[in-house]
Structures are given as C-alpha cells and as structure tokens.
Amino acid sequence: MQRMYLIPLKDRFMALIPVTILTGFLGSGKTTLLKRLLSEAHGQKIAVIENEFGEENIDNDILVTESKEQIVQMSNGCICCTIREDLRETLQLLAAKKRKNLLEFDRIVIETTGVADPGPVAQTFFMDEEIAETYLIDSIITLVDAKHAPQQLNDRQEARRQVGFADQIFLSKTDLVSKDETEALIHRLKHMNPRAPIKAVHFGEVPLKEVLDLRGFNLNAKLDIDPDFLKEEGDGHDHHDHDHEHGEHCSHPSHQHERGHGHHHHHDDDVKSFVYRSDRPFDPAKLEDFLGAIVNIYGPRMLRYKGVLNMKGTERKVIFQGVHQLMGSDLGPQWAEGETRTSKMVFIGIDLPKDIFLQGLEQSLV
C-alpha cells in the first residue's frame, strides 16, 4: 500500500496551487468549457494544461508556436500549455517558471483525453513529493454528453470510471433528449457515484464558481461548508439495507420504493458505490490492517473512497480518503458536544465485494 503525501491542513491552502482535472468523452463539451476559461475576462490567472493527444486543440492557430515547451500566454492573462511527454514534467516546468516569475498563474486546469482514466492523473499529485508540496487537487469534473452517454456507459469502462471519479458532473446536450431520458441518465449516474452533484449545462456555459474551488479532495473544508455532506437523504437507517444514495434532483419512479428493498435496473454497470456507517468507534490498528489488506487486493478497482471516522483514542474526527492504492488520513475538527459520533465511509469502485468490505469494517470496530 502506498501512502499519500499529505501536507498539514493549516498549511495546505496557503501555499499550494489548486488543480482541477477535467474529464469527459469526445463531444461532451470539454473544449467549449476550456475555450471559455482561456478567453473570458474572468479575472483569474489559470494555466490550462491541454493533452497533446486530445481530440481537438483549444485553438490550433494559437498553439502553433516556435516554443518547444508549447506554453502560450493568452490575452486574458491565462496560459495554455500542451503536454509533450509527461504530466509530471509539465507540472514541474510550470512551477519552476512561476518561482522565477517567468509565468504568472494562480491555478491549473488539466484536460484529459476523452478515453483517459482520471485515476493515474490524480495519483500524480500524491505519489511525487515535489508535486505534492506544490499542488493540491481541488476536484475532478466530468462532462457527460446526455445524447450519447447511455451507449458510452454501456460500451466503455473509461466512461464509467470518469463518472466514478467525479466530484462534480455536468450534463451537456440535454436539449437533444427527452426529460424522461435525462432523468433515467441522472438516476444511473447517481447509482454509480452518489457523491457528485449533477447539473445540466448548455454549450459549456458553466459558472466558474461551479468549476473552481470545489475542494472535492478536502473533506475537512467540505464538512465545514456543508455539515450534511456525508448524511444520507432524510433517513438514519442502517448501512446493510442500502446500496446507493440519491441526489436531490433524482425523481426516478423506482425511488418510490419501500425502504430496504433493492433496486432493479435495466443496466448493470460495473462501477458502483456503497456506504458504511457505524456509531461504534474503530480500533485504529485493526482498521489500518484491514484497509491495508483490501487496498493491496482491490486497489486497482477502488476508484475513490473517503469518509469521516470515529476513532478510539482521539476526540477529533478522522478524515480519510484514497484513490486506487493511495490512501491518506488527517485529523479533522473536534466532535461537537452531544454530537452522535457516527463513522461514515463511501466506496466507489469496479465490482467491489461489498460483503467483504462491510464484514471487515465491522470486525475493525472496538
């Protein structure tokens, strides 16, 4: 099991450059959104890292320059940069130029190719100490083409992984499908990833505040902003009878089911999520052993997992999260007086053996 490089929370937002990872299949609207970032007078200094193997360059005329490094200053103060070899090298180059005052930028947006799995891109920011001390992942944003998504999700595991990794999902082209089709798609996406809010967008017109500073990779911030972030909608029933949570915008008819009854889906996606909850504290040593074991065995299939834990021996919440084999934890705020100390964990992955996970977590309690 590999450990994430974790910078102490108090230092984290002061010095680090936030990074947004943008994913989505061909035609989902990534390029439209990036063009807006690079052309609008939004007052932010953003460095956009565009993948050279992307389907469509931001603007071929602008990017054809003599510069070997393919770094171009845009008229609105943003920077566009094309990955030549390796994302890590590109990030180091940008950081070095910023330190020498050769480039000015406040944040980075990385475009992945349509067929990319965002996992390895995200892992770059935890595996390399120099990168982890310079940058902080803010969020992974996935654009989903409402017209073609049902087929893409059926056919391509990369599309399902992009949904599983997302902190925010934007649905494009909803004007090309019926209301029922849109609702069915939202229901399907929520089944795969209950954490990510879903919002319909038109021609990449997304308010910047919904793209930047989401802090999807920092649970502490999210809990401070939204104390209900890890609460299930309107019910306190126990974890064994529920496979996934539903978003507020989901009015699919099959949600009018009796509590505790399973759902029947016409599709069987391999990316699924489940939630574990307990009011008993965890034994730190037992939990570490169990998580280490499952990450070693199932890590490649564990897309995102995170939670707030009640640990024996501390009066503070323990914030835990991981991407594939990389796992990290942090001390969060104090448990409030009179607050029920409930641990809650969300796992999103590919065909994960839910029963093994739940049983192992139960056995890790005090």
PLM ranges: what are they?
Residues M1-F13:
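Short, Lys/Arg-enriched N-terminal segments with co-localized hydrophobic residues
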Residues A15-Q152:
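Nucleotide-state-sensitive switch-loop elements of NTP-binding domains
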Residues A47-I49, E104-V109, Y135-V144, V163-T174, ...:
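Conserved beta-strand/loop subsegment of P-loop NTPase cores
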Residues P150-F165, I169:
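Flexible active-site lid/hinge loop adjacent to a nucleotide/diphosphate
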